[in-house]
């Protein structure tokens, strides 16, 4: 009954899928091994006779039981058979004392708790992040994934969950939001490196724990003769040294106790057999060499995860291998292929996303990890234009905006570069967005969220053909070309029929300078002021009542 109750408790220290094989050696295998050994030793200590003593003939059975219980509760000491016992002093007996055998079960249970603690810490910290790593790995390890429909549904669910969690990190990073302004350490759960950092800390705790356990074992056994108990025991075994000579885990020890007889104190020294030390010797030799092997495995695992977490090139190669094995037409030898993967990791997956894919690949296999990377890659390229615009869209000033800018905003040295760089970026963004407008629901929702209420929609092609050409047109390149502005005459001629993109506020900021007002009037004479309502024809076009002289003045002003 007791054994069944103890074994039923092992489900609370069961293994988890959100760790690698070395972690399970610590938190599952070693922990359960120590609990089992503690139960075995406890049965011998508390269920049998751990010590049996040789008492004088004058002792009755009750005195014999008393002597054995006293020697078990107090400490015995060891004296080799070739040394006299009568001449030993109290201090010398205290140095030879053996006091660890009573505490072996409790020491083993304490070690089991130490091996389990880093796993509980990892589970707690990982649960406070937006990425539920334990649930993700469980879903990827679902046995029903052999069914295609269930596998596709699980991959879709994982993709949606990762997208939501990673989008939250990108939003905080973009807006530079710090939930805790003073205690910056509490902002780590909101970063895109939190799960990876916590796993590396857990690995370090595993490594530190196994090193401390080796030191505690030497301290607990009081092996002053050996600096490292296991190596000393191995040397004694190879040299044929027995416990009688070494004194390690002695089977026979001595015990002193006093008996009050008729008011007089009688001192007795009896010889006892420590049967429990036969088990203790084998247990601690096994544990010492197991800890040594575990130390080697843990160091290698910690170094591996540290390397793949900090060295970006390994993450790029990891994603490239999965893309090459997927159904996507991806060739790593093409120009720009590695740059695409870099952008995929930097702008989309981040460190935690790559970590989750690695962990799922370890638990579920390469095929499932490849399918997940394929789905994430397709979603990234499907949302990359919207993602780029939402991440790089600047703030639009609440004032009247035109393209080209008013003459007061034009650099007199270089007419094609604005004095106000923020306005130039805003106008460039407006023009780039207008080229990607379609009638889909997703685009319309994006326009509603990103465009201000006073921005005008792009006109249709028929409306563009009815427009009068614009004489001056500047061509812009995107942000990936270092924000440079170019003026190409050939491109201007091709785009001459395309009107500028502009928008206006209902309450434009008045111009204080008299020259600015005059230039504004000249500009307005040539270009009709756009309407303020959305959805109407709001493009500034040339009017029929303008004179040639007014056109020439306005054009010379722009140049």
Curated annotation (Swiss-Prot):
GO CC terms in record: gap junction; plasma membrane
Annotated PROSITE patterns: PANNEXIN
Comp. bias regions, Low complexity: 503-514
Biological process per Gene Ontology, one example term: monoatomic ion transmembrane transport
Region (Disordered): 488-514, 527-559
Molecular functions (GO terms): gap junction channel activity; gap junction hemi-channel activity
Principal location class: membrane
Bilayer topology term: Multi-pass membrane protein
Annotated TM spans: 28-48, 102-122, 182-202, 283-303
Domain of life: Eukaryota
Compositional bias segments (type: Polar residues): 528-559
Keywords in alphabetical order: Cell junction, Cell membrane, Gap junction, Ion channel, Ion transport, Membrane, Transmembrane, Transmembrane helix, Transport
Cell compartments where the protein resides: Cell membrane; Cell junction, Gap junction
Similarity comment: Belongs to the pannexin family.
Annotated function: Structural component of the gap junctions.
Name of the molecule in the record: Innexin-10
UniProt organism field: Caenorhabditis elegans
């Amino acid at each position: 009954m007791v054994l069944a109750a103890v074994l039923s408790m092992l489900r609370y220290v069961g293994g988890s899928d959100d760790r690698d094989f070395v972690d399970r050696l610590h938190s599952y295998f070693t922990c359960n091994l120590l609990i089992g050994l503690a139960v075995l030793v406890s049965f011998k200590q508390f269920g049998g006779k751990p010590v049996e003593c040789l008492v004088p003939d004058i002792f009755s059975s009750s005195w014999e039981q008393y002597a054995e219980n006293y020697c078990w509760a107090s400490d015995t000491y060891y004296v080799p058979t070739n040394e006299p016992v009568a001449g030993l002093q109290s201090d010398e007996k205290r140095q030879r004392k053996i006091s660890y055998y009573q505490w072996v079960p409790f020491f083993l249970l304490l070690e089991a708790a130490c091996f389990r603690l880093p796993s509980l810490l990892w589970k707690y910290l990982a649960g406070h992040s937006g990425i539920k790593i334990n649930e993700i790995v469980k879903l990827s390890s679902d046995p029903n994934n052999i069914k295609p429909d269930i596998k596709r549904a699980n991959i879709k669910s994982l993709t949606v969950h990762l997208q939501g969690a990673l989008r939250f990190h990108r939003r905080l990073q973009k807006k530079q939001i710090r939930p805790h302004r003073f205690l910056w350490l509490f902002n780590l759960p909101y970063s895109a490196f939190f799960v990876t950092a916590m796993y590396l800390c857990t690995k370090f705790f595993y490594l530190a724990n196994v090193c401390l356990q080796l030191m505690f074992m030497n301290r607990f056994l009081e092996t002053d003769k050996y600096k490292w108990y296991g190596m000393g025991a191995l040397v004694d075994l190879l040299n044929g040294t027995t416990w009688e000579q070494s004194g390690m885990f002695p089977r026979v020890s001595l015990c002193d106790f006093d008996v009050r007889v008729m008011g007089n104190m009688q001192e007795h020294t009896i010889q006892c057999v420590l049967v429990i030390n036969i088990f203790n010797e084998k247990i601690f030799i096994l544990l010492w060499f197991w800890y040594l092997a575990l130390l080697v495995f843990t160091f290698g695992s910690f170094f591996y995860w540290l390397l793949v977490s900090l060295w970006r090139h390994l993450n790029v190669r990891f994603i490239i291998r999965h893309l090459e094995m997927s159904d996507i037409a991806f060739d790593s030898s093409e120009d720009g292929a590695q740059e695409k993967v870099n952008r995929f990791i930097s702008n989309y997956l981040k460190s935690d996303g790559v970590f989750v894919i690695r962990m799922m690949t370890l638990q579920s296999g390469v095929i499932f990890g490849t399918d997940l990377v394929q789905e994430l890659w397709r979603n990234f390229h499907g949302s990359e234009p919207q993602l780029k615009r939402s991440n790089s869209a600047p703030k639009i000033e609440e004032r009247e905006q035109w393209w080209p800018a008013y003459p007061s905003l034009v650099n007199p040295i270089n007419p094609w570069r604005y004095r106000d760089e923020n306005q130039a970026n805003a106008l460039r963004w407006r023009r780039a967005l207008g080229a990607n407008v379609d009638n889909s629901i997703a685009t319309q929702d994006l326009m509603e969220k990103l465009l201000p209420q006073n921005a005008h929609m792009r006109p249709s092609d028929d409306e563009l053909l009815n427009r009068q050409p614009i004489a001056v047109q500047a061509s812009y390149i995107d942000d990936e070309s270092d924000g440079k502005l170019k003026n190409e005459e050939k491109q201007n001629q091709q785009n001459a029929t395309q009107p500028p993109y502009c928008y206006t506020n209902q309450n434009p900021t008045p111009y204080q300078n008299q020259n600015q007002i005059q230039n504004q009037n000249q500009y307005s004479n040539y270009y009709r002021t756009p309407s303020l309502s959305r959805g109407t024809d709001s493009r500034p076009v040339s009017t029929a009542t303008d004179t040639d002289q007014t056109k020439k003045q306005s054009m010379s002003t722009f140049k």
